[in-house]
Amino acid sequence: MVSALLLRARQNGRAARCLDYPKVKCWALASLPKSSLEKPGFSQVRRFSVFHPQSQVNLDLTRNIGIIAHIDAGKTTTTERMLYYSGLTRRIGDVDEGSTVTDFLPAERARGITIQSAAITFHWPPAECGNATRQDPRSPRSASSHMVNLIDTPGHADFTFEVLRSLRILDGAVCILDGVAGVEAQTEQVWHQASTYNIPRIVYVNKMDRDGAAFGRTVREVASRLGGWPAVCQIPWFEGGDGRFVGVADAINLQGLLWSGGDGKSVKRFSLSELDEAESQLAQELRRARVALVELLSEHDEIIVEKFFENEEDHLSVSPADILDSLRRCLLEGNGRKIIPIFAGASFRNIGVQPLLDSVVDLLPSPQETPDPEVAIGGVKGSLRRLLSGDLLVEQKEKAAPKGKQKKKAAVVADSRNAIKQLHGCGLAFKVVNDAKRGVLVYVRVYSGSLDRGSLLYNTNLNVSERAPRLLKMYANDAVEVDSISEGQIGVVVGLKHARTGDTLVACTTNKATPPEPLDTLQLRPIDVPPPVFFASVEPHSLAEEKRMHESLALLLREDPSLHVSIDEDSGQTLLSGMGELHLEIARDRLINDLKAKATMGPIEIGYRECPLGASGPVTKIFDREIAGRKGKAGCTAEIEPFDPETSPAPDPAALSVEIANGNQIVILAPELQIETNKKGLEESPILPPGLDVDAVRSALSNGCLAALARGPQFTFPMHSTRVTLTLSPTAHIFGNETTSASLSAATRLATSTALSNLISNPASASATPGTCLMEPLMNVIISVDEASLGAVVHDISSSRGGHIVSLDEDVPIASTDLSIPNTETPDPELDLPPIDPAKVYAPPDPFQSSTVVGGSMASDARNRPRTITAKVPLKEMVGYLKHLRSLSAGRGTFVMSVDRFEKMSPPRQKAVLTELRGVY
């Protein structure tokens, strides 16, 4: 009884104390054009004066975080409260009204969902005239104002790449769960994606004010489905034990936090003794939560064990600062896989957001505390820290030096350190946006040094240099100009014509067009792009509009690399491929409404693949014609055969290269090449003509082969599960200076295309099966329904849709269902933890799920119990499935899916699909 608690506290002379979340006194609108201030909705955003002009940034006081979750879990709603309480906005935006700061695209406001990630910067605790202090901080960290660079990410599965490229540059994340739905399918997907990048995460259980919210059940699902030990830092506070949700009980500080007032700024704090007087049940549960928290930490952190013994083995006597330090150590050491701190709240009711912000500052890492970024330079891979120390350059130079001509160790070290001194800044372009007024905006995370306004940036992926005329600090759709973007910060470079997602940008002290060797080869780990599975034709309204349409498509692809454009050689149609139906719908809206392309998009179709049924035999082709006014002549031999990663024999160990691309294996044989390494670390051969090194040969042969594999010989779909063996003979295929990269690529494409055609007309042997067959995307599908709908949904998947049920469980751990891009890194054996038994996890009881319920409500609870179906289903059968699922589950079912693999069709199914595609086959 909250009112009784307040009254008793006053009667005893212990007035409830307000939490010291500083009031913001010194806000100022940045100097922006009046036209900008007149924009609808813009007036709510205001900025810290310390952001403009740019000041020196303390990395210890910086947090680069993302908000990740299932769709409709409350990501944007929580973000709006964070901006409001930090003082950045004057009012709280509403998703339903379309007045949010981070969802600013017309399509986002119309649909009420996040489509593209939005970056925004604020301070927590709020800075007061550039100097923030808190009289009663939770920890030394939350006593100082921190700069928080926050990215609000989409929750829909079709925008997986938008989440991936945001996670690539983040240091920490807040995963928001719906307290009613618990851990949903898309939650598992984004959690697994964050794990591949080793990002520490905390969990915020939202919507605790809703009917059916179950904090305890959600905690147990975190353990069983996300694979970490839940560290319950807060428990929900319901008025009278089972009334409305009014606040949280803090297990770290042993206090109750009660929210009152419409905007949530009024927060009152009650000690454990005060809770004992009026909320004894809550106080007892809070003690149990503290004991469980200390016990859990003691299993993973030796220091907290020492603190426990220093406090006479009293769990309640361990200081909050010691607990926070222990939580932070466990979180950072395990990268969010061992310990998962859990908090509670109801963002829409303005409850729980300020303590969540405190936890972002207290628990999540600064840029200096994150795992060392991976880099590659001159063919040598290592960490950024090794590069900056000079050790990686020493290794690269020693590897590149010809045998017998190595310099002394001291000289190599001196050269390496001198080279590193010329590196002024290094950053990764993780997003490109075409803004109607500002032009092309390239979002950059700086990992070393700084990128300054007016400096020359060298793109090591494209080998081009561009000047950075303007630099911006973004606040969703608005921006403030800055002089530089320093290490650990996220900013925007305006006006770059060539930079793409995943490119590395380097600035050197020499400010020359090309950095000194080998800095011109420095590359940060790129961003993986998942394969598209849907496509639609795009046609201009007239021939005069065709050029404009292709220019708009090029801009669209630069913004979103998960889209793909190809040309159907038979029909001449332009095909746009994407991750899902909604993905292509949004791309169409962007193309027509924003980029003003006068074009029409056809119906959305499935991207099938073609695979060989037999081998082709070797085919040799000589290309001999002019290319761009220059005579070119080269040759190549290609041979086609089926490929299966598990059953196909290993390629020739003497191969020049073996590459897996788009599900195909390309093997390059060049037995007669005499390969040597030059002083730059590049491979050369005296047999090759000048200007053509071994890497250029590899690239030319690979590109030519990939171009041919993009179109199958029988059904015109891209090839898959195909091994192409390319053989290059210097005596038969190299013709002096006439042989260039372009002619080699053209010869390879010609040979590979002919070999593909021979699969049908001239197979390798009379016994070989001629032709190719179709492959279709087989999807990993996770469906969430209640017990009452389980039978109908399982029957529909296994019979009507030709799917295969993998598991039928209440709890499906993420490790068993990979819904993401495969992780190419070697897993840490210490983090390969066994499944967690939910029975061993502390979780507070849920007041609305009592076992003493009488009558038929127990049966009703059983029928409403959430169940999870994991299945593998052909993509064709999942098109439009959501509407059907909702009809089977009374509107409560949800699902998420991603590509598992491409699978060969049976002859009857292939015939049916071709009949549907072409009318009659």
UniProtKB/Swiss-Prot annotation:
Q: Name one GO biological process term.
A: ribosome disassembly
TM ranges are none
- CDD domains attached to this UniProt entry: EF-G, EFG_III, EFG_mtEFG_C, mtEFG2_II_like
Q: Which residues bind GTP?
A: 69-76, 152-156, 206-209
Q: Tell me the GO molecular function terms.
A: GTP binding; GTPase activity
Domain called tr-type G: residue spans: 60-368
Cellular component annotations (GO), alphabetically ordered: mitochondrion
Cell compartments where the protein resides? Mitochondrion
Transit pept. (range)? 1-55
The family database entries (Pfam families) matched by this protein are listed as: EF-G_D2, EFG_C, EFG_III, GTP_EFTU
Q: Which UniProt keywords apply?
A: GTP-binding, Mitochondrion, Nucleotide-binding, Protein biosynthesis, Transit peptide
Q: Which domain of life is it from?
A: Eukaryota
What does the protein in this record do? Mitochondrial GTPase that mediates the disassembly of ribosomes from messenger RNA at the termination of mitochondrial protein biosynthesis. Not involved in the GTP-dependent ribosomal translocation step during translation elongation.
The family assignment reads: Belongs to the TRAFAC class translation factor GTPase superfamily. Classic translation factor GTPase family. EF-G/EF-2 subfamily.
NCBIfam families named in the record = small_GTP
Protein name per its UniProtKB record: Ribosome-releasing factor 2, mitochondrial
Give the originating organism: Emericella nidulans (strain FGSC A4 / ATCC 38163 / CBS 112.46 / NRRL 194 / M139)
Classification of source organism: Eukaryota, Fungi, Dikarya, Ascomycota, Pezizomycotina
